[in-house]
C-alpha cells in the first residue's frame, strides 16, 4: 500500500509529508502512518490512520490483540484505547516496551522493538531471544512514497536473524479517527498555518486522496471511536476522502520500464567461464587478470618496454589516475573503498569494472589489453580466478557507493535539516555536492528540490567517515546522530545485505545506481585533481 507526498517539512520535531494539494500531511509513528487534513471553516480536517494491526494466531481468533490490550491495562495505560474491537495497531504495541511511555516516544520511527518474549513468539511462531524489531513501513525518498508493508519485516536485534511473520498475526488496516491520541495532538496544532492553502476552483468537488494498493489485499477499514477519544461514544457514519486504487503491473511492451532489465553478464554466477558467451561486456576472468597482474604490468620499472607510444601514455595515465584517486600503498588517499585491503590499481580495476558492466563508458577494456600484453610478453602465469576475493572486492565498492547514494537520497527527503557547523574538506564537499545534484537530477517524476548547505554538509560528514575506512554503519550512525535522521542506519543496513550479483530487476537497478554514483565521484575527483584543487 502506498501513500504519495510532494514535499517534507519539520514542525515541532516531527517530519511531515505534505501531499500535492497541500491539504493533507502524513507523519510516521511507531510503524504506522497518521494522516491529518487541513481544517475548514472551524471544522477539523479528517484524521486517518494506516498500518499493520495485530490480530490472532488463527483466522478467527484475536489472541494477540487481546494479549496486547491486557498488558496495556496491567501497565496502567487505561487512557490508551486501541482502535476497533478486534485489532490493535502496531504503534500501540510500542507501548509495551518499558522504554516507551507514550506515542510521542516513537514519533518518526518506522518500526517497533518488542522485548516481550511472549509477544515476540506470537509474532514469529518461534522462541526468540529478547528483542525483535518489527518494521511496518518504509519511506522511498526517490519516489516520494510512503510504503506500508502487507507483511512486516521482523529481525532479531542481537543476531540479526530475519524471521518469517506468523501467517495470521498481522493485517494491513485503515481507520478513520475522531481525534489523535492525546500525546500527539499538540504536535499538529497550527501545522497548516505554515502551509499555504491552495486556491479552490469554483466548481470544486469533494477532495479525494488516492491510496495505491500494491498487495494482494486491500487494507481492512476499521470503524471505531478509539485513539484516546475519551469514551466509547456513539458510532456514526463518516465519508472518507481516501479512495483505494488498485495497482496493476504493466503487461507487455512499455515505453518506460520501472527498472532496467537484469544484466546477466556477471550476476548469474561467479564462475568466469559462465560469461564467455555473454554479450560484449567485462567478465570476471578479465577482472581477475587485471586484479592479479596490474601492479606488475603497470608499476614495474620496465613496464613501458615493448609498448607503442599510445600504450605507454595509457600506462602512465592509469598509474596517475590510481594515485589521484586512491593514493599509494604507503599513503592511501581518503576516498571510497578505503576499507578494502587492495592496492590502488586493484581498486581502480574494480571501480572501472563496476562502471563498465552497466554499459557506461570506461577505460576498463584498455586496462585489460595492457595487462594482457604484459602477461603474454613476459610469460606470466595467471592462476585460476579466486571467486571469493573478487566477490568481496566488488561487493565492498558496490556497497560503499550504494550507501553513499542512499544516504544522499535519505537526506534529500528533508527540505529542512538542523543547522550545524559540520567541518568537511574541500574534496569531500565537492563529492557531496556532485552526488546530491546527480540524484536530484534523476528524480524526474517529482518537482526538483533545493539542495541546501546542510544537505552538502551532512552527506559530507557521512563520506568523511566512509573515506576514512571506518565502515558504512559507522558513517551512518555518525550522520544519524548529527541529523536525528535515524532511518539512515536502517537504510544503510539494508544496503549491507545487498550484493552486486543479486538477480532480478531489483538487483539490476541497484547495480545501475551504484555505477552511476561511482561515475559521478570519479568524474569530480579527476576534474578537481586536473585543475590542482585537490587537497
From Swiss-Prot:
<dbReference type="GO" id="GO:0030430">
    <property type="term" value="C:host cell cytoplasm"/>
</dbReference>
<dbReference type="GO" id="GO:0019033">
    <property type="term" value="C:viral tegument"/>
</dbReference>
<comment type="similarity">
    <text>Belongs to the alphaherpesvirinae UL21 protein family.</text>
</comment>
<dbReference type="GO" id="GO:0042025">
    <property type="term" value="C:host cell nucleus"/>
</dbReference>
<protein>
    <recommendedName>
        <fullName>Tegument protein UL21</fullName>
    </recommendedName>
</protein>
<keyword id="KW-0946">Virion</keyword>
<keyword id="KW-1048">Host nucleus</keyword>
<keyword id="KW-0920">Virion tegument</keyword>
<keyword id="KW-1035">Host cytoplasm</keyword>
<comment type="function">
    <text>May participate in DNA packaging/capsid maturation events. Promotes efficient incorporation of tegument proteins UL46, UL49, and US3 into virions. May also play a role in capsid transport to the trans-Golgi network (TGN).</text>
</comment>
<comment type="subunit">
    <text>Interacts (via C-terminus) with UL16.</text>
</comment>
<dbReference type="InterPro" id="IPR004936">
    <property type="entry name" value="Herpes_UL21"/>
</dbReference>
<dbReference type="Pfam" id="PF03252">
    <property type="entry name" value="Herpes_UL21"/>
</dbReference>
<feature type="region of interest" description="Disordered">
    <location>
        <begin position="251"/>
        <end position="279"/>
    </location>
</feature>
Amino acid at each position: 500500500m502506498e501513500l504519495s507526498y510532494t514535499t517534507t517539512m519539520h514542525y515541532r520535531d516531527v517530519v511531515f509529508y505534505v501531499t500535492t494539494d497541500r491539504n493533507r500531511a502524513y507523519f510516521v509513528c511507531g510503524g504506522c502512518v497518521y494522516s491529518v487534513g487541513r481544517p475548514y471553516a472551524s471544522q477539523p480536517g479528517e484524521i486517518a490512520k494506516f498500518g499493520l494491526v495485530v490480530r490472532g494466531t488463527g483466522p478467527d481468533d484475536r489472541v494477540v490483540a487481546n494479549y496486547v490490550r491486557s498488558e496495556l491495562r496491567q501497565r496502567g495505560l487505561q487512557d490508551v484505547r486501541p482502535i476497533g474491537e478486534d485489532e490493535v495497531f502496531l504503534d500501540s504495541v510500542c507501548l509495551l516496551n518499558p522504554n516507551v511511555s507514550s506515542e510521542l516516544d516513537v514519533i518518526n520511527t518506522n518500526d517497533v522493538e518488542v522485548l516481550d518474549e511472549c509477544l515476540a513468539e506470537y509474532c514469529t511462531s518461534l522462541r526468540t531471544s529478547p528483542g525483535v524489531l518489527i518494521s511496518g513501513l518504509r519511506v522511498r525518498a526517490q519516489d516520494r512514497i510512503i510504503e506500508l508493508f502487507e507483511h512486516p519485516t521482523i529481525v532479531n536485534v542481537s543476531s540479526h536473524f530475519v524471521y518469517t511473520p506468523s501467517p495470521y498475526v498481522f493485517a494491513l488496516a485503515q481507520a478513520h479517527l475522531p481525534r489523535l491520541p492525546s500525546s500527539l495532538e499538540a504536535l499538529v496544532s497550527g501545522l497548516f498555518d505554515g502551509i499555504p492553502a491552495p486556491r479552490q476552483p469554483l466548481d470544486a468537488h469533494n477532495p479525494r486522496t488516492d491510496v495505491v494498493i500494491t498487495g494482494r489485499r486491500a487494507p481492512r477499514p476499521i470503524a471505531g471511536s478509539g485513539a484516546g477519544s475519551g469514551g466509547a461514544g456513539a458510532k456514526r457514519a463518516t465519508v472518507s476522502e481516501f479512495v483505494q486504487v488498485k495497482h496493476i503491473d504493466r503487461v507487455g511492451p512499455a515505453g518506460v520500464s520501472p527498472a532496467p532489465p537484469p544484466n546477466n553478464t556477471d550476476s548469474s554466477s561467479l564462475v568466469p567461464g559462465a560469461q564467455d558467451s555473454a554479450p560484449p561486456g567485462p567478465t570476471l576472468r578479465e577482472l581477475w587478470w587485471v586484479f592479479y597482474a596490474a601492479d606488475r604490468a603497470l608499476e614495474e620499472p620496465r613496464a613501458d618496454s615493448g609498448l607503442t607510444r599510445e600504450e605507454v601514455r595509457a600506462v602512465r595515465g592509469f598509474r596517475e589516475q590510481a594515485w589521484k584517486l586512491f593514493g599509494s600503498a604507503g599513503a592511501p588517499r581518503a576516498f571510497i573503498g578505503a576499507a578494502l585491503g587492495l592496492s590502488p590499481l586493484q581498486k581502480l580495476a574494480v571501480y572501472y569494472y563496476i562502471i563498465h558492466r552497466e554499459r557506461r563508458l570506461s577505460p576498463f577494456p584498455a586496462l585489460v589489453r595492457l595487462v594482457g600484453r604484459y602477461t603474454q610478453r613476459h610469460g606470466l602465469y595467471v592462476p585460476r580466478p579466486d571467486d571469493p576475493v573478487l566477490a568481496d572486492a566488488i561487493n565492498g565498492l558496490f556497497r560503499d557507493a550504494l550507501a553513499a547514494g542512499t544516504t544522499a537520497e535519505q537526506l534529500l527527503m528533508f527540505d529542512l535539516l538542523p543547522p550545524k557547523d559540520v567541518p568537511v574538506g574541500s574534496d569531500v564537499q565537492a563529492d557531496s555536492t556532485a552526488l546530491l545534484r546527480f540524484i536530484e537530477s534523476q528524480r524526474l517524476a517529482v518537482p526538483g528540490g533545493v539542495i541546501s548547505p546542510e544537505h552538502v554538509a551532512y552527506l559530507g560528514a557521512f563520506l568523511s567517515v566512509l573515506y576514512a575506512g571506518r565502515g558504512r554503519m559507522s558513517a551512518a550512525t555518525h550522520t544519524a546522530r548529527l541529523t536525528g535522521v535515524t532511518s539512515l542506519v536502517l537504510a544503510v543496513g539494508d544496503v549491507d545485505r545487498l550484493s552486486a550479483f543479486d538477480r532480478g530487476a531489483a538487483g539490476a537497478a541497484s547495480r545501475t545506481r551504484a555505477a552511476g554514483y561511482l561515475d559521478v565521484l570519479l568524474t569530480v575527483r579527476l576534474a578537481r585533481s586536473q585543475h590542482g584543487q585537490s587537497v
